[in-house]
Amino acid sequence: MRSSSGLNGMRENNSFPDNTRNPQILEVTPLNSMPYIGPVTHASMSSNRMNDSVEKVGGPAMIFLPSDSSSEFSNLISQTKTGVALTGSAAMGKIGLTIGLVDIAESEDSYYFRVALPGVSRDEKEFSCEIEPDGKIMIKGATTTGEQTVCKHNQIFKMLTQNLCPPGHFTINFQLPGPVSNEEFNGNFGSDGVLEGVVKKVYYED
């Protein structure tokens, strides 16, 4: 009973006076106000860093992205109209010269090497690979890239960007780990621009 009467009394005491039924609206200037800034998230931090670090590039540019990142890829490549973007295995190689990169391997009785020669003429009159008994290898050739215009499919194209080697002759020298039998050499210069060679080792008796 007391709880019931008390509840009724609260309802009666909470009745509003007549002058509050039509309240007067007042324009009040706040003493102090600050914009609300939500909690800092990892996504917002990374986007801010990306916006701060990305700079528009007017000339040719090359972007290396070893890992898959579609958002970073789209953001970076959109900053340049003449850029080149590399992803995956293409971005894991050496940065710099395209001609003359060499891989060397060995088995029990032979050495194996391969040399990157993109844009190099395979004409036997211009290309040669000489092997000395001490394991020294000298490659001579001529590049066909770097021209100002390209004629393909009955059309003439003028170069907008040029990053490959200029046309001309060149030499590449490198050393195998040990002496070889230069008469036992098998080589192949493929259409993919890679020269491969296998040469027998030589063992000298003490």
From Swiss-Prot:
Induction field: Not regulated by heat.
Family under the similarity heading: Belongs to the small heat shock protein (HSP20) family.
Domain called sHSP: residue spans: 92-206
Oligomeric and partner information: Does not interact with IDM1.
Keywords assigned by UniProt, alphabetized: Stress response
Pfam family, one: HSP20
Top-level taxon of the source organism: Eukaryota
Gene Ontology CC annotations of this record: nucleolus
Region (Disordered): 1-23
Origin organism lineage: Eukaryota, Viridiplantae, Streptophyta, Embryophyta, Tracheophyta
Protein name: Alpha-crystallin domain-containing protein 22.3
